[in-house]
């Protein structure tokens, strides 16, 4: 499981013209792009959620748990792209939807269980993600 985390001052996800998830404008928050591979499980999803919740990448070396920062969770199978050969990425390392969707849901639920204000995109949808990266700070978490 991979989570590409970006510190943001605002973020929103739109599907078919409707905003389905957004962080308050001018709030300090996190955008979490979540990729799942074949060997991932619920335990990994929960451990990564806890790691993200306590990761000190906000201003003054604080974590989302320290300041109650909101988190926007968006599924992102392309985090498992293999570009080693040719010019077309392979997606073979990305888990199929039947495996990935429940784990992305588990990740978001685990964050909520820790006390996070969580917004989400729509799994498998063609999403438009808008964000203002703060810093910029971008970190790849992986278990």
Curated annotation (Swiss-Prot):
Its main location: cytoplasm. InterPro entries: Daa-tRNA_deacyls_DTD (IPR003732), DTD-like_sf (IPR023509). One of its GO terms (biological process) is D-amino acid catabolic process. It catalyses: glycyl-tRNA(Ala) + H2O = tRNA(Ala) + glycine + H(+); a D-aminoacyl-tRNA + H2O = a tRNA + a D-alpha-amino acid + H(+). It comes from the Bacteria. GO terms for molecular function: D-tyrosyl-tRNA(Tyr) deacylase activity; Gly-tRNA(Ala) deacylase activity; Ser(Gly)-tRNA(Ala) hydrolase activity; tRNA binding. GO terms for cellular component: cytoplasm. A motif (Gly-cisPro motif, important for rejection of L-amino acids) lies at residues 135-136. Its EC number is 3.1.1.96. Keywords: Cytoplasm, Hydrolase, RNA-binding, tRNA-binding. It is found in: Cytoplasm. A Gly-cisPro motif from one monomer fits into the active site of the other monomer to allow specific chiral rejection of L-amino acids. Homodimer. An aminoacyl-tRNA editing enzyme that deacylates mischarged D-aminoacyl-tRNAs. Also deacylates mischarged glycyl-tRNA(Ala), protecting cells against glycine mischarging by AlaRS. Acts via tRNA-based rather than protein-based catalysis; rejects L-amino acids rather than detecting D-amino acids in the active site. By recycling D-aminoacyl-tRNA to D-amino acids and free tRNA molecules, this enzyme counteracts the toxicity associated with the formation of D-aminoacyl-tRNA entities in vivo and helps enforce protein L-homochirality. Belongs to the DTD family. This is D-aminoacyl-tRNA deacylase. The gene is dtd.
């Amino acid at each position: 499981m991979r989570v590409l985390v970006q510190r943001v001052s605002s973020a929103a996800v739109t599907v078919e013209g409707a905003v389905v998830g957004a962080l308050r404008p001018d709030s300090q928050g996190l955008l979490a792009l979540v990729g799942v591979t074949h060997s991932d499980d619920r335990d990994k999803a929960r451990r990564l959620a806890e790691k993200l919740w306590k990761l000190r990448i906000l201003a003054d070396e604080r974590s989302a748990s320290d300041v109650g920062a909101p988190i926007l969770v968006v599924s992102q199978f392309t985090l498992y792209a293999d570009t080693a050969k040719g010019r077309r990425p392979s997606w073979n390392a990305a888990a199929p939807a039947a495996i990935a969707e429940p784990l992305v849901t588990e990740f978001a639920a685990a964050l909520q269980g820790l006390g996070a204000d969580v917004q989400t995109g729509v799994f498998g949808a063609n999403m438009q993600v808008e964000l203002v990266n703060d810093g910029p700070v971008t970190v790849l978490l992986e278990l």
